[in-house]
Structures are given as C-alpha cells and as structure tokens.
C-alpha cells in the first residue's frame, strides 16, 4: 500500500484568547472535505475528554432527606442542594476530596466557607448556599470527585461514618458552556480552508486545555493503531521530480484571474467553471477553453492576449497541485 506524502498538510495552529473563559483556535490549511470531517470529530472528542468536578453525595446534620427542611434556615433543602450543585470547584492534582461546611448563625453561608482536606479552587466563591436566620450550626460534609470517576463509591463514608440520611447528587455538568467550529475559505484559492474552534468554559478548565486534552487522547489512540498496522513500513510516493530538484512555484500561478484585467463576461464564464487562479487557467487546452458555455470568440481571444502579456500560454504543464 502506498501513501501520498502531501495529501494534506497542516501549516499553522494559532490561539486567540478572547477572555479567561473563551478562546478561538485556528488550524490551517486543509483541502477539500478534510476540514469538515476533522472539525466534527474533534468537537465530539473535546466533549468526551473534558472532565469536571462534582459533589456526588453529602450529609447535612439534622436533615433526614432532601424532602426534610432544617428549622432556622430560610431555604428549603432542595434549594440548598441546587446551590451546592452550581458551585464550580476544582481539585488540584487529585481526583477525590472531602469537603466540609460548619458555620454558626445567624449568617449567610457562601461557597468560600467550604474547607477541604485537599488543595481545591472554587471559581464562584460568592455563590450563596443558604441563609441561617437562627442561632443554630449548619454542618455539612460532602464528597467531591472527578467526573471520570462517575461510579465512585466510598464505603467508609457511606456505611461506617454515616449509615443513613446520605443525599446523592448524580448529575455531572460539563464545564464547557459552548463549543462550535466553523470553516473559512481562503480568498486566493477556494479549495484551501481554515478550521476555527470557538470554545467557552465555566472557568474550571481553560478552553485551550480542553483542546490539548482532546489532541492528547486522539494521539494515544492512533499511536496504537499505527503500531498495529506498521505504518512506517509502507512505501511512500515522492511527489518531487526524479532528479530531486526542488520545485519552484511561480507566484503568478497563485494570482487570481482578476489580475488578467478581463471583461466581466469573461471572468464570469471562467468562475462559473471553477477557474479562479491563473494557474488553473493555463492548464486548460484551447479546445476546452473555447467549449466553455457562453464564452464567445471575442472573450476567447481576450483571454489569450491577456495571458501573453504575462508570458503564459494555455495547455501548460504544472508539476504540483495549487
């Protein structure tokens, strides 16, 4: 099996940080449909490989279940659970952490009142959890885990420390607020395209890190496939000349046909047949050019004269793809 060296080559990846929560990543250049296929693939993998941190179960003293309200607290228990669920938290350099809140009222309990046995970061510390109106103690112990450990169970926490009245929070939320990709065509060659990713997160992970994690996992999977098929053993097709001389691209070939200063009728006829560059035009034979629909002899002669001014002729051979 043979593989062409430059079927498509990526030349540049650039990142523009709009804010701490949003970044735009540009990848170029692509040919044909590679751009759309790769964009959809990377978008799906980013969602799969981006993890978050979540409180999975907790114990609030003197509360028997989520339907039992604690006297002296303005909010009901279900509202408190919603507030805890909306806290954006990250465990640094670990996957599991114990969290605790212990505060005596009257007071306002916020996310910054949470303490842990691990190094944690809370991105919305002013998030209100509950309002304590009476002179009581609000005491809550929680277990926070990485979303990769969805089926995590702590038997010591559940069955030895607290044998009952444990409240479970099962829904994991993705830290990605929005993720879109779009394609932009180059002006001088419509066959070449740029791929853009617009990533916005809640702050618990940087948008660039979402993209890096995605590429890391893709590489790990495909490294195994390449080693299995013995990719390096296949013979590659050399696109260069047999004498190994470097091909010099004439810059005129990459210019738009608008530079030929043709009439509007001639330009429209060429563009309707997907001829946008001078290099595309000179590869056509005289018979094929004159047979273009709606292109008369006057336009035909006009094109020949314009090409002669550039020292070019029809039916020219180009050893490389534009």
From Swiss-Prot:
Residues 1-229 are annotated as: Alpha N-terminal domain (alpha-NTD). One of its GO terms (cellular component) is DNA-directed RNA polymerase complex. It comes from the Bacteria. It is an enzyme of class 2 (transferase). InterPro entries: DNA-dir_RNA_pol_insert, DNA-dir_RNA_pol_RpoA/D/Rpb3, RBP11-like, RNAP_asu_C, RNApol_insert_sf. Keywords: DNA-directed RNA polymerase, Nucleotidyltransferase, Transcription, Transferase. It catalyses: RNA(n) + a ribonucleoside 5'-triphosphate = RNA(n+1) + diphosphate. This is DNA-directed RNA polymerase subunit alpha. Belongs to the RNA polymerase alpha chain family. The keyword Transcription applies. Its EC number is 2.7.7.6. Homodimer. The RNAP catalytic core consists of 2 alpha, 1 beta, 1 beta' and 1 omega subunit. When a sigma factor is associated with the core the holoenzyme is formed, which can initiate transcription. One of its GO terms (biological process) is DNA-templated transcription. DNA-dependent RNA polymerase catalyzes the transcription of DNA into RNA using the four ribonucleoside triphosphates as substrates. Pfam families: RNA_pol_A_bac, RNA_pol_A_CTD, RNA_pol_L.
């Amino acid at each position: 099996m043979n593989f062409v060296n430059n079927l498509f080559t990526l030349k540049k990846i650039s990142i523009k940080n709009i804010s701490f929560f949003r970044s735009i990543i540009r990848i170029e250049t692509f040919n044909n449909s590679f751009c759309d296929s790769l964009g959809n693939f990377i978008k799906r993998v980013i969602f799969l490989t981006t993890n978050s941190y979540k409180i999975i179960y907790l114990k609030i003293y003197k509360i028997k279940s989520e339907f039992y309200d604690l006297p002296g607290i303005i909010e009901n228990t279900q509202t408190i659970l919603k507030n805890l669920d909306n806290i954006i938290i990250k465990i640094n350099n670990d996957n599991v952490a114990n969290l605790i809140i212990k505060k005596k009222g009257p007071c306002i309990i916020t996310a910054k009142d949470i303490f842990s046995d691990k190094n944690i970061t809370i991105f919305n510390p002013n998030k209100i959890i509950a309002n304590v109106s009476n002179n009581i103690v609000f005491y809550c112990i929680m277990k926070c885990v990485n979303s990769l450990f969805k089926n995590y169970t702590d038997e010591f926490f559940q069955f030895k420390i607290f044998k009952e009245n444990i409240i479970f929070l099962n829904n994991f939320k993705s830290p990605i607020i929005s993720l879109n990709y779009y394609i932009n065509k180059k002006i001088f060659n419509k066959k070449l395209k740029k791929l853009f990713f617009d990533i916005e997160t809640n702050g618990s992970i940087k948008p660039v890190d979402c993209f890096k994690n995605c590429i890391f996992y893709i590489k790990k999977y495909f490294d195994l496939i390449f080693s299995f098929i013995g990719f390096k053993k296949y013979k590659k097709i050399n696109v260069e000349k047999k004498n190994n001389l470097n091909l010099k691209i004439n810059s005129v070939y990459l210019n738009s046909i608008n530079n030929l200063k043709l009439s509007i009728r001639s330009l429209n006829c060429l563009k309707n047949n997907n001829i946008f560059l001078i290099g595309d035009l000179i590869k056509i034979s005289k018979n094929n050019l004159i047979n273009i629909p709606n292109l008369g002899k006057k336009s035909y002669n006009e094109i020949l004269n314009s090409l002669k001014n550039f020292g070019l002729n029809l039916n020219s051979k180009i050893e490389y793809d534009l």
